């Protein structure tokens, strides 16, 4: 029984990674790719200031998106788990949260463009209310637009694991804390949050890995004025520089694995899996 599963994992997970690592050591010319062991791609990658700037942008997007998705996701999950008593209404409201995911990421992302544009709904409304006199140019094709799109796209990935963890919390623990005289804030901080840490960590892994590997959102929502690692890899692929793209992908993969490894040292998520 385990052999077919192992074969699937090797074929669809291990083998592609091995191929990417292998190609990252090859050489590329204007006309061909030469299979050879060479560190030139990594030397160029780590010797370029652009690499460090792009990785900084990637971590910046991941961190800011994580802060907002965690804040929104925890609030929504808390409301569904502890303020909605009816299971039917919990299911209905949870399904409402998933409605945007019935369309593709690109459609949901592009839907912000007419809203945030210079002559879009947001600027027109603010001008009509007298809040501003001139349209705000930074609403679209900026880091603000990129992060807004990320939060919109990936908040549900934070809501689901947190909500799942909260639903497993024994309500008698909360009642016992309340009977002991604990305030709502104390119950939240000392009971709910510690018991929700595995769900928070799973959501964090989802959001951080998705943001760090994304390139379409940065391309469209920044107007090609910003870049992250995913965009860097995409550009290399467009130029048929597959060895360079593979080297960048390997570094990104190792970076994500290190980040996840650090996070897993603080929270044991095995009980949630």
Walk through the language-model features, giving the residues of each:
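Non-cytoplasmic
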Residues: 16, 20, 107, 114, ...
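Short membrane-interfacial helix/loop motifs at transmembrane-helix boundaries
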Residues: 13-49, 115, 119-120, 219-224, ...
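C-terminal transmembrane helix and the adjacent membrane-cytosol boundary/short C-terminal tail
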Residues: 80, 163-178, 246-273
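N-terminal signal-anchor/first transmembrane alpha helix
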Residues: 1-19, 92-97
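Interhelical loop and adjacent transmembrane-helix boundary motif
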Residues: 42-50, 211, 215-262, 271
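Membrane-interfacial helix termini and adjacent extracytoplasmic/periplasmic loops
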Residues: 39, 109-151, 185, 221-225
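Transmembrane alpha-helices
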Residues: 7, 11-14, 152, 158-171, ...
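Transmembrane alpha-helix signature in integral membrane proteins
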Residues: 49-82
């Amino acid at each position: 029984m385990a052999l077919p599963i192992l074969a699937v994992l090797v074929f669809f997970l291990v083998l592609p990674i091995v191929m990417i690592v292998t190609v990252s050591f090859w050489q590329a010319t204007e006309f061909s790719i030469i299979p050879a062991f060479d560190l030139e791609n990594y030397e160029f990658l780590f010797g370029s200031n652009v690499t460090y700037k792009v990785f900084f942008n990637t971590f910046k997007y991941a961190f800011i998106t994580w802060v907002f998705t965690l804040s929104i996701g925890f609030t929504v999950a808390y409301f569904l788990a502890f303020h909605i008593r009816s299971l039917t209404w919990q299911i209905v409201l949870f399904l409402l949260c998933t409605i945007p995911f019935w369309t593709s990421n690109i459609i949901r992302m592009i839907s912000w463009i007419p809203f945030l544009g210079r002559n879009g709904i947001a600027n027109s409304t603010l001008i009509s209310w007298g809040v501003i006199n001139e349209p705000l140019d930074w609403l679209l094709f900026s880091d603000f637009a990129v992060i807004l799109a990320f939060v919109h796209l990936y908040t549900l990935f934070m809501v689901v694991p947190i909500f799942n963890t909260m639903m497993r919390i024994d309500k008698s623990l909360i009642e016992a804390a309340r009977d002991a005289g604990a305030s709502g804030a104390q119950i939240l901080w000392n009971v709910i949050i510690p018991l929700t840490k595995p769900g928070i960590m799973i959501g964090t892994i989802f959001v951080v890995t998705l943001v760090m590997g994304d390139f379409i959102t940065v391309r469209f929502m920044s107007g090609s004025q910003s870049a992250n690692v995913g965009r860097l890899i995409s550009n290399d692929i467009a130029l048929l520089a597959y060895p360079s793209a593979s080297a960048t992908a390997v570094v990104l993969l190792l970076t994500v694995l290190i980040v996840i490894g650090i996070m897993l040292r603080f929270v044991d998520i095995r009980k949630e899996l």
